[in-house]
Amino acid sequence: MSTTLRRAWSSLNGNDGVLPYFLATLNEVSLLQARPPPGHAAAALALRRRRRDTPPSRRRVPKENVDPGSSPAGHSPFRSPTSSAKPLGNRNRGLLPPRPPSSNPLKRKLDVSPAAAADSSGGAAAAAAAAGGGCPAPDSGVQVVVRIRPPCRVEEEEDARAPDLCVRKTATNSVAIQGQDFTFDAVADEVSTQEDIFKLVGLPLVENCLSGFNSSIFAYGQTGSGKTYTMWGPLSALSEDSTCSERGLTPRVFEQLFSRIKEEQGKHEDKELTYHCVCSFLEIYNEQITDLLDPSPKSLQIREDVRTACVYVESLTKELVFTTKDVTQLLVKGLSNRRTGATSANADSSRSHCVFTCVIKSESKNLEDGSNSTRTSRINLVDLAGSERQKLTHAFGDRLKEAGNINRSLSQLGNLINILAEISQSGKQRHVPYRDSKLTFLLQESLGGNAKLAMICAVSPSQSCKSETLSTLRFAQRAKSIKNNAVVNEQKEEDVNMLREQIRQLKDELHRMKSGGSDGSNGSFSTGWNARRSLHLLKMSLSRPTTFQTIHEDSGDVEMEIDENDVEKPYNQDNMVISPPGDKECKELQASLKINGGTSLDVFDGENLMPTKRSCSDDRYKLNLAASIQRGLQVIENHQNNGAWRRASVGFNARIVDVQPCKVDVAIQTEPEESEARDNPLALISSHVLGTSATVSNDPNACRDLQLVQYDAGITRDEPKQQQILKAVEKVLAGAIRREMARDEQCVKQAAEIQQLNRLVQQYKHERECNAVIAQTREGKIARLESLMDGTLPTEEFINEEYLSLMNEHKILQQKYENHPELLRAEIELKRLQEELELCRNYIDEKEVLQEEIQDLKSHLHFMLSSSASIRRLWPPVQLSHGVGPSPVTNDADGDNNAVDTPDWAEAESKWVTLTEELRVELEANKSLVGRLRSELESEKKCSEEVKEALQTAMQGHARILEQYAELEERHIGLLAMHRKIREGVEDVKARAAKAGVKGAELRFINSLAAEMAVLRAENKGLQDQLGDTAEAVQAAGELLVRLKEAEEAEALAQRRALLAEQETEKAYQEIDNLKKNYDQEIVALNQRLSESSHHQETTLAIEACDMETTKYDTAGSPGDQQWREEFNQQGGSFEVSKSTDLNSWFSGYDKCNI
């Protein structure tokens, strides 16, 4: 073996000595030690054969592309067997190869066993077969998929002399280039489709997103390798039908996402599951961030939230999406605004990195426990600009500047990935330069943070792009070593501790009753105190199980006999239930709320005390309120007059603690007489008690001290005692199971406490961050003062910076002050009190105004009614002409008729009188209605005053009851002290009895102790009954308060109805005024027309008399005059007739229109 080791060391110092040879030598040594070697010559021959079969590599790996961990050689078991990497040079090689770090995951591949040595040649093929067969590998945090772009026509023409592709797919998850094999999660060759890429990367991303994980997809590669096509597809495919085969990864992801959202919502309809998706689209061009959804020339800035340590882009447009069509529209808009340019390598080259982000928030509610769950996940789809070389792209000007920024950004990304890979492999912490570029700073969660990362590395198979393809594959290999820490982003809002919450609410209610009870007469009682809420809190507190505090004892098991009858009674009373009363009590008091049962208290050996349970019956609302109040008052008076009540130094604890049932030491004494067993108060527990405690107990300490004791075989003939022994054994076994279950419950409670402590830690962390910001401003101020003292900073600039710093500090302190919970609570309380005061003032002012308006309307109505009769007597009766009746006719000498219409004023006046009478009747009805409503309002006011007085009295009684209830809780300490003393005395008696044995004198002493304990038990039961009666009285008072509150609401409703009636009366008054005004105007118009009509008749009669005299003295007339008369007659009659006709017709029509 020494010869073999010497040759191994010489091989390490030779030209071909590398780590695999040393490992193979160690393998040979292990084989030689496992079985007797045939000789040193055989071992040396095997070593020389292994060295001869392994050809050396001719190619060195560039130092910047070496894996961040230790770089094994080409034929190491760490690499694929077909690798042909060149060994390390002499200057990098020492006596021993560098030891890989202990946390290097590649060490798992090393196996120096004989089986591993035999199968070392097919290791890579087996790994590839396992990956291809669908066997899930351990999740490394980063999924790397390589996609080989099919060669284009130009590349086929250029590579006509060398038709072989530079990279080829050798397995489902490995590729080969220049004799080197690279293994990844999956490899998509030239014939792969967009659907294949979506199945490899998109489907897991959607499922991770719905599970609450942050997920990211990076597309990396050289320019023209198909990154943009893979991520988005052509723009024509986005605007076409969704069945287009060229659609990219992003639209397919969101189509699947919305489909799964609908499926989840249909599956969890009972949880009220809702989803909200918010998308944004940005690009990084020449280290400047712009918004693709809002193409403005301004540059956006990256901000970091100091409270949550989240990085975000300020003023970035965010769109809420609901369907795949909405996402497609955003993609089309953003990609059309993205900066692209033409180069010699790519006609449509992307000149910027673009990031499409979608934040998905899901909210669900569990109806069983009332908890709310919120999951938030983020999807980052990143299309990186391709790296390029100037000698291939022939870029100049702006294109050259863009290429420099792109290469610089990708170089910083590669440096970051190298550091992260080194940290993941070595476990040593290093500074991670996230802030070197805006790309890495923006996506730091995806790189080594809380996200699941998938990287699509696009490569070109052309021989001209061989070096870029090799660099991309090495980059992907380094990225595969990164370890992310993805967690589910879920927040659950669980219910708070009901015990503390109810105690706090009851104390607040008591304080509110004491402070605001005397303000109930101001009309705003309902705004300051809610009786229904107080009753609900009281019922919840009474319905919760109540137990005493746990009293631990250090004494061990003592063999004693326990009286079965004395112990069974309190165990049978294991529930305190507020149940409907029986038939007898319903006949006497239908409203009494019966509280049955009591607490199960083991005063002998009970480390824990039996819980009491209350369950409120729904039938208590149907009982009579008055009888219930009377019953409660009687109970309180009886308690005050009872001497035992005053002498009792114990109280009932209504505080809710953990349910910890009792345990009883079950043992057997050697006395077989049944009479002594019946007389002994420390007899065996009945089987019913054992079964009950076995099924109810959940205490981890329950039955801790139970054991089986030896007993005399002579008394086993008693069959009942044998059954008791068997059931005691059953209880011991059940106690073991209960202890295990109780341990689980204790773990749950401790987890809840840990969660509460975590919340406190988060709160303290937030305060520390605020203090850190303030400290940072102080340090900046000190630095500015130093610069000012040194003279490097001008005074004006110092003043400006100091002012800005102080403004920022003031803003931080203002936010801290405004967000203080005490300040917010005080502001809310002040606003509530101001609103109540304003309501009271408005109510008083409106009441006074309404009363004044009612008085004015009453006086105005009285005046109108009294004046209408006098006005009607003063006006003469008028007649209106309808122009349709017969009229007197006068004939002139030419046969013309003059018709004069006589207006019928009496008929019109009768109509007006009828209308006035109707209005008077309606007015009287309104007056009676107002009087009735006024009387109702007065009665409601009286009722309201009575209700307020009763409510005040009930409030005072309720406050006294609550004080008594609180006093009972405080007096529970006295009960615990008394119980401890009793238990110590019993323990002393047990110890003495165990030492001396149970004999006549000792038995009588024990009997006397049992009598005292029975008295104490009876007193305890009386206290429980008193507490039940108190609870009954409290509930009755609560019911009274609720009824009084409802009466107050009815009073408010009656007041609103009275207000509506007054408004209707006011409207009636307004209608009467309008009718009177119209009536006055019509009367004046009719008088004027009557005077004009009489004057017109007189004028007409005078004209007709003149015409008759002229006709009498005229002769036959001249021919001209005769001709004029004929022409006038042909035109339609004489002048007088036409005039008279026109006047009559106009007056008649006018009268018709107006009447």
Curated annotation (Swiss-Prot):
A GO molecular-function descriptor: ATP binding
Region (Microtubules-binding): 349-353, 382-388, 431-435
Composition bias type Low complexity, residue spans: 87-96
Superkingdom, natural source: Eukaryota
Coiled-coil region: 823-861, 934-971, 1006-1089
Pfam families, A to Z: Kinesin
Residue segments, region Disordered: 47-117
Cross-referenced InterPro entries: KIF15/KIN-12, Kinesin_motor_CS, Kinesin_motor_dom, Kinesin_motor_dom_sf, P-loop_NTPase
Keywords: ATP-binding, Coiled coil, Cytoplasm, Cytoskeleton, Microtubule, Motor protein, Nucleotide-binding
Recorded GO CC terms: cytoplasm; kinesin complex; microtubule; phragmoplast
Record-level GO BP terms: microtubule-based movement
Kinesin motor domain residues: 141-482
Protein location: Cytoplasm, Cytoskeleton, Phragmoplast
Signal peptide range in chain numbering: none
Task of the protein: Plus-end directed kinesin-like motor enzyme that plays a critical role in the organization of phragmoplast microtubules during cytokinesis.
Designated name of the protein: Kinesin-like protein KIN-12A
Species of the source: Oryza sativa subsp. japonica (Rice)
Organism lineage: Eukaryota, Viridiplantae, Streptophyta, Embryophyta, Tracheophyta
